[in-house]
Curated annotation (Swiss-Prot):
Function of the molecule: Catalyzes the transfer of acetyl from acetyl-CoA to desacetylmycothiol (Cys-GlcN-Ins) to form mycothiol.
Annotated ranges, domain N-acetyltransferase: 40-179, 187-344
GO annotation terms (biological process): mycothiol biosynthetic process
Binding site for acetyl-CoA 2: 276-278, 283-289, 315-320
Species annotation: Frankia casuarinae (strain DSM 45818 / CECT 9043 / HFP020203 / CcI3)
Protein name: Mycothiol acetyltransferase
Amino acid sequence: MTSLSWQQTLSAMDVDDIVSLLAAAERADGTGPVSEDVRLALRPGLRIGAGRHLLAVSAAADTSGPNVPDTPGDQNAADTSTMPGRVPAGRIIGYAHLGGVDQARQAEVVVHPDHRGRGVGTALVGGLTEALAAPSSRLDIWAHGDLPAAAALATRLTFTRTRVLLQLRRPLAAGTPLPDPRLPAGVTVRTFVPDQDDRAWLAVNAAAFADHPEQGRWTLDDLARRRAEPWFDPRGFFLAEHDGALVGFHWTKVHETDQTPPRNAQPGPIGEVYVVGVLPGAGGAGLGRALTLIGLRHLQAEGLDSVLLYVDEDNVRAVRMYTGLGFITYVRDVSYHWERPSTG
């Protein structure tokens, strides 16, 4: 049997189990199963806003029942089988994170590869929808990698595909040509100074991503959590100024290991165009492209052989700019939307 448990915070053992679960899913699927926001929430005792964790826990170490497919409306029956001997009793075999605000919740769901097809995913999604308090609640669940199994489950549970996030990549090895960045007249670029630039950067970030459901909502705490990460390096965080005011930025990131390298490639470090933003109506034409190139040149000088970035598929202007700089689509993440049926 499998039991579901809601947690406001996680124990150290919970975190270890979830991290192992994520690693197993990543090996099986070839893509990371959760976002950076969720990974940053996986800290013992940490509570972030209204975020909550839903754990699917194996209640028996060894069962002999047949595989049962995910079947809506029969969650208890669907959870009666686990892989014999694979996961001890009390270990986490499925995980969901619920965030966002009351009437517009966002979630991510992952099931251990050895326990798929047994109703765990259906049970987790059912637990998420049941937890929504408001009568008009809406829920968006991210499925990383656009996997067929996730699409099939979403269809069965009446979720609608609404948003696609592209991961783009391009080579960056020494000698790979990059155009010269051309800054608009009067614009200068320097690197980020922690504490000094935090609030100014947050203001420009919020304005640049006013219509973005995640990036535009960043707070000082969100920035502080990332500054505390081992990958944070202000030398790769570029700020554009005009007349002393911040008008744009390019924050780069270096991953120690590419968790989803191309097939038959040895995993190594990879750079990331973490976030590029320009203050609306400021800075002049071409500032976003120039900032992108400045960051790419920095990553190339750091010895990175390739670079990735994430962009919404419907952000046609940004996609056009990135493809014009040699980026191609590597993987897709999909958001599925659900609304509580009207009772009227």
